[in-house]
C-alpha cells in the first residue's frame, strides 16, 4: 500500500471550497428567480473571460459583488445559490467586465486569487468560471446542429429545434502521488513548463475505465512505471476549462520502477527522496506545484510538511 499517510481531515484545497447552497430546486422556478434577482440583498458577480473584479482589503482579497440594481442590464445570468442568511447570488457573464468608478478594484482570475479568497468567494468564482466557459463553447446542439439557448438559470442549454437538453461538461482526470519501496516520490515535468518545475503525474479518465485503472494506465504510459494498489485522497474542480481532479496515492510495483518517459506528455520524470526534493527547492533548482493545485497537497502528504511558497504559473 502507498506510504503516503491517510488524513483524518479533508485537505484544504483552494478550489474545493464553498459557502453557498447551490439551491438547484430553484433553477427552473422563473417567478422565484425573478424575485430573487430584484431583491435588494441579492449580490451579482460580473464575469468575463474567466475573470472578475477583486479588491484587496485589510481582511484579505474579496470579490466585488454588486447589488442587482447596479449590475449591467445585459449579459447571461447564472444562478449560483443562496447563503445561510438567505442572500441569493448570481453571475453575470458578458463580453467584458463593466467599467467601475472604484479605483481599488482590479480584474483577476482563479489562478491568481483562488487561494486568497474566502470559502464563499472561491466557491462562487469557481462555479461562475466553469459555467461561463461551458456556455461559450456549447452554442449549438450536438444532436442536430441547431442553436441552443440557456435554461435552468444557466445550468442547462436546450436545443431550439429538437429540444434536446445539454448539461455542463465535467471531464474527470486522475492526479496521483506515486511512491516506491524506498519511499521516493515520482514527479514529472512537461517541456512547456518553466525550467525546474516538477509536479505529480495526471491524465484524463478514458471511456469504459475505472478511475483506479486510469491511475495505473497514465503512470505507465507517461513514465513506464507499473502501479499496484491505489487509494483515493481528495478531489478538486479545475475549471481550466472543465476538469475535476481526482487525487490518489499509489505504490509502484516491485521491479516496475524503471522510468521510461513517453516524450510527448512528459519531457522528464524522476524519483525524488525527501532530502533530494528539500535540497533542490532550497537551491532554487526545483519549483514545486503551485499552491492552488491539488498536486501540491498530494506532494505535501508524502513530504510530511508544507512546501515552500512558489510563484503562480
Predicted regions and their residues:
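Cys/His-rich short segments
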Residues: 127-179
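Short beta-strand micro-motifs in enzyme catalytic cores
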Residues: 76, 88, 155-157, 172-174, ...
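Active-site-adjacent beta-strand/loop module that shapes the phosphate/pyrophosphate-binding cleft
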Residues: 236-260
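Conserved hydrophobic/aromatic beta-strand scaffold that supports enzyme active sites
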Residues: 79, 140, 175-177, 187, ...
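N-terminal strand-loop-strand
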Residues: 157-199, 204, 226-227, 250-252
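Nudix hydrolase/Nudix homology domain
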Residues: 1-138, 149, 193-198, 263-313
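Active-site lining segments that contact anionic ligands and/or coordinate catalytic metals
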Residues: 227, 233-235, 243-247, 266-267, ...
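The catalytic Nudix box helix
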Residues: 199-233, 248, 254-256
Amino acid at each position: 500500500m502507498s506510504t503516503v499517510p491517510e488524513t483524518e481531515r479533508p485537505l484544504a484545497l483552494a478550489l474545493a471550497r464553498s459557502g453557498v447552497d447551490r439551491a438547484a430546486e430553484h433553477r427552473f422556478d422563473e417567478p422565484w428567480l425573478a424575485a430573487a434577482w430584484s431583491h435588494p440583498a441579492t449580490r451579482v458577480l460580473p464575469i468575463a473571460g474567466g475573470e472578475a473584479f477583486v479588491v484587496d482589503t485589510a481582511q484579505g482579497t474579496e470579490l466585488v459583488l454588486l447589488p442587482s440594481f447596479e449590475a449591467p442590464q445585459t449579459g447571461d445570468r447564472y444562478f449560483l445559490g443562496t447563503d445561510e442568511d438567505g442572500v441569493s447570488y448570481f453571475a453575470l457573464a458578458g463580453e467584458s467586465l463593466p467599467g467601475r468608478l472604484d479605483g481599488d478594484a482590479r480584474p483577476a482570475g482563479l489562478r491568481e486569487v483562488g487561494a486568497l479568497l474566502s470559502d464563499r468567494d472561491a466557491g462562487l468564482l469557481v462555479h461562475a468560471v466553469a459555467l461561463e466557459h461551458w456556455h461559450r463553447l456549447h452554442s449549438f446542439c450536438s444532436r442536430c446542429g441547431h442553436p441552443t439557448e440557456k435554461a435552468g438559470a444557466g445550468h442547462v442549454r436546450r436545443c431550439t429545434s429538437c429540444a434536446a437538453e445539454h448539461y455542463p461538461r465535467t471531464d474527470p482526470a486522475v492526479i496521483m502521488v506515486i511512491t516506491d519501496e524506498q519511499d521516493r516520490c515520482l514527479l514529472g515535468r512537461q517541456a512547456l513548463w518553466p525550467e525546474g518545475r516538477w509536479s505529480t503525474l495526471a491524465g484524463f479518465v478514458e471511456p469504459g475505465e475505472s478511475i483506479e485503472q486510469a491511475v495505473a494506465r497514465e503512470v505507465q504510459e507517461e513514465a513506464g512505471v507499473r502501479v499496484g494498489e491505489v487509494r483515493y485522497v481528495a478531489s478538486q474542480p479545475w475549471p481550466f476549462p472543465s476538469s475535476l481532479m481526482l487525487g490518489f496515492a499509489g505504490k509502484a510495483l516491485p521491479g516496475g520502477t524503471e522510468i521510461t518517459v513517453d516524450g510527448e506528455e512528459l519531457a522528464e520524470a524522476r524519483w525524488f527522496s525527501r532530502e533530494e526534493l528539500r535540497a533542490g527547492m532550497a537551491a532554487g533548482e526545483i519549483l514545486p506545484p503551485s499552491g492552488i493545485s491539488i498536486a501540491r497537497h498530494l506532494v505535501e502528504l508524502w513530504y510530511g510538511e508544507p512546501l515552500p511558497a512558489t510563484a503562480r504559473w
